[in-house]
UniProtKB/Swiss-Prot annotation:
The record marks 243-244 as: Cleavage. The active site is at residue 244. Its main location: mitochondrion. Pathway: Amino-acid biosynthesis; L-arginine biosynthesis; L-ornithine and N-acetyl-L-glutamate from L-glutamate and N(2)-acetyl-L-ornithine (cyclic): step 1/1; Amino-acid biosynthesis; L-arginine biosynthesis; N(2)-acetyl-L-ornithine from L-glutamate: step 1/4. The alpha and beta chains are autoproteolytically processed from a single precursor protein within the mitochondrion. One of its GO terms (biological process) is ornithine biosynthetic process. It comes from Botryotinia fuckeliana (strain B05.10) (Noble rot fungus). Heterodimer of an alpha and a beta chain. This is Arginine biosynthesis bifunctional protein ArgJ 1, mitochondrial. PANTHER family: ARGININE BIOSYNTHESIS BIFUNCTIONAL PROTEIN ARGJ, ARGININE BIOSYNTHESIS BIFUNCTIONAL PROTEIN ARGJ, MITOCHONDRIAL. The record marks 165-166 as: Involved in the stabilization of negative charge on the oxyanion by the formation of the oxyanion hole. Belongs to the ArgJ family.
């Protein structure tokens, strides 16, 4: 097949469903577990059996075989808008940024977040730290996706966001990918199965595809039903600073391109930037949102409007739910843990404390062992504000030991278990503590007693499997 085989496909071709998609059924953790591995029974409840997807967006998941060991599972995701749309993205702050991060950022800047047609994603290879050749590969992926649309050039260059995820330091099998992009385009569709296959295609060590959808309304057009759908991937190397983490959100609401970047940034700060699995920030972190306005209604153009506030709330809540799915699929994780810091002098200080506890190996291993070792929580709280050795302790106003309290909040609605109250240890009922720690969900509450600000982080525990998965990652 020639690389430009889909150059003249009409837009109408986009709406033809194809039988070439691959539903997510098995072989998840493809790169660290045997191919016959199936989705764990405990995770099946997080996979939707149906969805309500935004108008004017079509998706596909196609098998390329980016990793030689992957013989049949989708590893190329394609999302297309039937009309050019507004888009925005936030990217990793890791200094070794992957080629697709650089290419996509420059493309969005060049186009001022307008005229975007698609997102193309491969899993199995991160295309990070791959030099000039890797940059050219990312550009070729975007260009090949662009060629699939029968639209004249607007003179602004490419219009496709490119993402990659997988092993760092290896070049993409670019010819295999380029040959399959027309196939992926030809297989675009709007069914639930198409969306699920696309969510599967971006997975690496994930044990299940992460897909959500919902409907919402805006104050100025209450009669219009808007839709939002999104997918994310990530199970390890998760401590976003904008895990390996990718996220893609699409909506048919009419949002002005000038507003999307700030809307997404605020949503990500309260969601993807508030999760941690292992404390490592990936070279490839990217979360993108696309809005094509296909549902109609009044365009949201003002930051001071009720529509803007309503959409911000919807986007933030949606992104938060997606981010939580990443934590629930933490590599080897057995627990979903909410870290809530309250009564802090500042939100920044509260976030530092929550973040430090969330990535503490000692806290996480204690949770896995069902050990109510609150001393580790207190220890992480105490050093959270210290950025460098030798920093004077009087520069840390956030924490007053004699005002600090720590509790476990059970997920079954039963009373909290107080571990430390105003700096004084409680007589802990170890049997009760063990009972609480048997649950999959747990909240750790830290009250600082010094203010009114708070912050929330979501994390998981560390198990033996985490070491096994990451020790075997490249094999």
């Amino acid at each position: 097949m020639a690389l430009n085989a889909c150059t003249k496909l009409p837009v109408a071709r986009l709406i033809r469903p194809s039988a070439s998609y691959h539903p997510a059924i098995s072989s998840i953790r493809y790169y660290s577990a045997p191919p016959e591995s199936t989705i764990p029974a405990a995770k099946l409840k997080y996979i939707p059996t149906s969805g309500t997807y935004p108008k004017g967006f079509l998706v596909s998941g196609t098998h390329v075989g980016v990793k030689p060991t992957n013989k049949s599972t989708p590893d190329l995701a394609f999302l297309a808008s039937e009309t050019p749309c507004a888009a925005a993205a936030v990217f990793t702050k890791n200094k070794f940024q992957a080629a697709p991060v650089t290419v996509s950022r420059k493309m969005l800047q060049r186009r001022s977040n307008t005229g975007i047609r698609s997102v193309i994603i491969n899993s199995g290879c991160a295309n990070a730290v791959t030099g000039k050749g890797g940059m050219e590969d990312a550009e070729k992926m975007g260009a090949e996706a662009d060629r699939c649309f029968d639209t004249p050039s607007d003179g602004k260059g490419g219009s496709s966001i490119v993402m990659s995820t997988g092993v760092i330091g290896q070049r993409l099998p670019i010819q295999k990918i380029l040959l399959k992009i027309p196939t992926a385009f030809d297989g675009l569709g709007s069914s639930h199965e198409h969306w699920l296959a696309t969510a599967t295609a971006i997975c690496t060590t994930d044990t299940f595809p992460k897909l959500l959808s919902r409907t919402f309304s805006l104050p100025s057009s209450p009669e219009v039903e808007y839709r939002m759908a999104g997918m994310t991937k990530g199970a390890g190397m998760i401590h976003p600073n904008m895990a390996t983490l990718l996220g893609m959100i699409a909506t048919d609401a009419p949002i002005a391109p000038t507003l999307l970047p700030s809307l997404l940034t605020k949503a990500v700060n309260k969601s993807f930037n508030s999760i941690s699995i292992d404390g490592d920030t990936s070279t490839n972190d990217t979360v993108a949102v696309l809005a094509n306005g296909a549902a109609g209604g009044k365009e949201v153009t003002s930051e001071s409007s009720e529509d803007h506030a309503a959409f911000q709330k919807v986007l933030t809540e949606f992104a938060t739910d997606l981010a939580k799915l990443v934590v629930r699929d933490g590599e080897g994780a057995t627990k979903f843990v909410t870290i809530r810091v309250t009564e802090a002098p500042s939100e920044i200080g509260a976030r530092k404390i929550a973040s430090t506890i969330a990535r503490s190996p000692l806290v996480k291993t204690a949770l896995y062992g069902k050990d109510a070792n609150w001393g580790r929580i207190l220890c992480a709280t105490g050093y959270s504000q210290i950025s460098e050795p030798g920093q004077p302790i009087n520069e840390v106003p956030e924490i007053i030991p004699e005002k600090t309290s720590v509790s476990f909040i059970p997920s079954d609605g039963s009373p909290e278990l107080k571990l430390l109250v105003n700096g004084e240890p409680e007589s802990v009922d170890e049997a009760r503590a063990a009972e609480i720690l048997e649950h999959e969900d747990l909240e750790i509450l830290i009250k600082l007693g010094g203010g009114k600000e708070e912050a929330v982080y979501w994390t998981c525990d560390f198990s033996h499997e985490y070491v096994t998965i990451n020790g075997d990652y490249r094999t």
